[in-house]
Each structure stands twice: as C-alpha cells, then as structure tokens.
Swiss-Prot record:
Organism for this UniProt entry: Tetraodon nigroviridis
Keyword Transport: yes
Coiled coil feature spans: none
Membrane topology note: Multi-pass membrane protein
Family statement drawn from the similarity comment of this UniProt entry: Belongs to the complex I subunit 1 family.
Record-listed E.C. numbers: 7.1.1.2
Keyword NAD: yes
Transmembrane spans: 9-29, 43-63, 75-95, 106-126, 146-166, 177-197, 228-250, 259-279, 299-319
Name by which UniProt lists this protein: NADH-ubiquinone oxidoreductase chain 1
Length: 324
C-alpha cells in the first residue's frame, strides 16, 4: 500500500509541484525582463519586489467564472486544456534530474511522441470553441508544430547516432569530455530555433498574433481553463530548455562535484530560458510564409545532410588504426 502510494502519487507530485512553481516564477521573470528591456519596471506592487504577483494571478484566474460560449462543444472544450497540461507534465517524467521518475530505454522517442500529441489539444481547443479566429489560430499552430517537429526529430536522430544511445543518461556519459554544442554547433543552433517555434514563442508566435487573431486558439477561454493552457505553454518552454541543456550543454555532469548535478542542469536551463525572453524582447514576429520557408527550405535540407554526415563519420573512422 505504502509503496503504491509513493510510486503513483508522491513521485509524480515531487516533480509536478516544483515544475508548476518554476512556471509561476518564470512568468514573473518574463514580465520583469521585458520591463527592464523596455526601460520600465515590471510588476512591483504585490509582495516584495512583486514576488507574489504570479500567485495573485493564479488565484485570480481560478476564482473567475469559467465562461463557455453557448455554441461550443461542451466536453471537448473542457477536456483540451486538461490534456495540454497533462501532456506538459508527463514530458518531465523521463528527464534525469539527476534520476528520472520513469527510467526508460527509449526516453527520447517518448519526448517526440508526447510533444506531437500536444497538437491534439491545440486543434481540439480551436475546433471546440466554434469561433473562426480560434480555428485559424489552431490550424496555424498545428501546421507550425508539425513542421518544426520534422527538424527536431532529424536533429535528435543525428545526436542519437553521434552519442550511440536513446537515453539521456547516455548523452550524459557521451559529454564527459566535450559538450556536444562544440562538435555539433549547427545542430544546436537549428535545435534552439526549432524549440522556439515548437513552443510558439516570439518571433514565431504566429498562433497568438494579437494584431490579427486576438489571442489564437485559446481566444474563447477564460479563468481556470485559460490558466491551464498558460501553465502548459510555460512548462513546455522550461522542459525544452532543460532538454536542450541535457542534449548539448553536457547535461548535468561535473565529475569533481556530483552533488551539484541538479543545480548545474537547472542553471543551464535557466540561462537558456533567459535567452528565450531576450529573443522575445528583441525580434519582431515572422510572416507566416517566412516561418514555413525557414523550416522546409532551409532547416530540412541542412538537417538531412547532417544526418548523412553523422552516419558517415563513424563508418569513416572505423577503418583507422587505434591511436596510441
């Protein structure tokens, strides 16, 4: 009984609660960073230095009345935000921080599978809202997500060939002597840009283009369900950056200080998340055709070429005599 309680309730909660707390303070950090970059102060009224602002926002959203459009599809309308958050939380289970909750042999395949399932929550919410703006936003988001998943998958394939394993622990071991960002820097650059597009962040925030689509696929959502979408989006941003740190920035390995493993990984993920915010403050939104041109005409041929290159490398060097 106790073991069941620990494995099925306490273990998941042990990573879900910190992730949700991190998401809350990431929203505050984003508002502060954008504020200072636009030469103004961010939130600074609620609590010391505005530290209680995200908690106030969360409470406000969840005590609002959940308004539902009369013409919407009732069950799907409520189910999709729940699906979005569930998927965003499940993604964290196989991440070694330093030990995964789910120790899988094919962890990277699970990431790809679960991140492509997120498409259904977006499409479902756009369709269930029964609003043309929500549907246009959802279709854009789905096209963008599916397109950039192609390059993410191919980059992951190259890295798997490079390191020789599907688990992030293998990546950890492979990067003990050199971080993968150095030999595979073109992959790292394309991966980072693709994660920006995959998480619908500026300059790829076409789905919530305020100028033409009000707020994108979640335009009809208010209160609690909207907060669930919001939490899912920011949890995905944090997850993608933690994954990027694991794949390219030597994961969490310091041979001299194994105690600092988790702090090390979190610091790298936080720095990458700050760059996400910096990009948002600096760049204007892409046009839709430029967004699609970038992936299909630029990234796809390049990633395919690099997959072939990484396939050829081990075969080429296999014939060399061992170095004494």
């Amino acid at each position: 009984m106790i073991t069941t309680l620990i494995t099925h309730i306490l273990n998941p909660l042990a990573f879900i609660v910190p992730v949700l707390l991190a998401v809350a303070f990431l929203t505050l950090l984003e508002r502060k960073v954008l504020g200072y970059m636009q030469l103004r102060k961010g939130p600074n009224i609620v609590g010391p230095y505005g530290l209680l602002q995200p908690i106030a926002d969360g409470v406000k959203l969840f005590i609002k009345e959940p308004v539902r459009p009369s013409t919407s599809s009732p069950i799907l309308f409520i189910l999709t935000p729940m699906l979005a958050l569930t998927l965003a939380m499940t993604l964290w289970a196989p991440l070694p921080l330093p030990y995964p909750v789910l120790d899988l042999n094919l962890a990277i395949l699970l990431f790809v599978a679960l991140s492509s399932l997120a498409v259904y929550s977006i499409l479902g919410s756009g369709w269930a809202s029964n609003s043309k703006y929500a549907l246009v936003g959802a279709l854009r988001a789905v096209a963008q997500t599916i397109s950039y998943e192609v390059s993410l998958g191919l980059i992951l394939l190259s890295l798997i060939i490079f390191t020789g394993g599907f688990t992030l622990q293998t990546f950890n071991t492979a990067q003990e002597s050199i971080w993968l960002i150095i030999p595979a820097w073109p992959l790292a650059a394309m991966w980072y840009i693709s994660t920006l597009a995959e998480t619908n962040r500026a300059p790829f925030d076409l789905t919530e283009g305020e100028s033409e689509l009000v707020s994108g696929f979640n335009v009809e959502y208010a209160g609690g369900p909207f907060a669930l979408f919001f939490l899912a989006e920011y949890a995905n941003i944090l997850f993608m950056n933690t994954l990027s740190a694991s794949l390219f920035l030597g994961a969490s390995h310091i041979p001299m200080l194994p105690e600092l493993t988790t702090m090390n990984l979190m610091t790298k993920a936080a720095v990458l998340s700050l760059v996400f915010l910096w990009v948002r403050a600096s760049y204007p939104r892409f046009r839709y055709d430029q967004l699609m041109h970038l992936i299909w005409k630029n990234f796809l041929p390049l990633t395919l070429a690099l997959v072939i290159w990484h396939l050829a490398l081990p075969i080429t060097f296999a014939g060399l005599p061992p170095q004494m």
